[in-house]
Amino acid sequence: MADVTISQGITSIKNDPNFKKNRMAPGRVVKNVVVHAILAVLALIWLFPIFWVVLTSLRAEKGSYTYYFWPKALTFDNYVKLFTDTSSINFPRMFLNTLFIAVCSCIITTIFVLFVSYCMSRLRFRLRKPFMNLAMILGLFPGFMSMVAVYFLLKAVGLTEGGLIRLALILCYSAASGTGFYIVKGFFDTVPKSLSEAAILDGCNGMQVFTKVVLPLSKPIVVYTILTAFLAPWLDFVFVRVIVGAKSEYWTVALGLYNMLEKEYIYNWYTSWAAAAVIVSIPIALLFIFVQRNYVDGMTGAVKG
């Protein structure tokens, strides 16, 4: 009797239209398995270099060439060396140089981009469309194409010597940042203009509308702008290489890591180079982890241009 009841129950479930609708077809199962297998392989490929760098940073043996993958001994001495051995490569100073340049560039770039984007979104003026088209065309070319011209301009005004080198790098990263307004403008376009009009009726001026109405509603794109503005100077190598050159007191971490792999340093500094790579990536990783949701939401602002 119990078997008959169970059989009837199974039959009724199979005849249920919702069961048939939700049941996954065999072909779809195979497709999902293949897709997830490919994604797993790609994830391993992408994660392997990170794992290798971390493992190398903990390796006790010196040198860059080894016949084994797993270190014979693990140690944190490579991290300690970065901050204690400053006789030939001064990593703490490189880190502070990079942090100073990145923070200053980030602040200036964020202000420029937000203001230009808001103007392009809300204001209507002559030559607005040609300016937008010109900015889009210029954005298609990589920044290093202007590297030589920028260097000679900076040299002509005396910004390639002494402490002014830091100012020169900040100008390189932030001076023309306002032309990269398209994504932020797209997000501002989604903010209802009726809110701005209501604020004006309540007595707000243009700046108050921007700071008290539009910006609080645009937190995702502000976070996106801050992150992208910080990453450019933090990771840049080309402009630093050209402008700073051999002046080691003004090196950033990108140029410092590059020089750690030079012939005279590579044997003693290779594992410390890996440790420095880990340290440099930590601030960026933490920023992305904490503001990932806002960053993704900000990227959707490009949908409506």
Model-inferred region functions:
Residues 4, 9-13, 31-305:
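A structural signal for multi-pass alpha-helical bundles of membrane permease subunits
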Residues 1-26:
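Short, Lys/Arg-rich, polar N-terminal cytosolic tail immediately upstream
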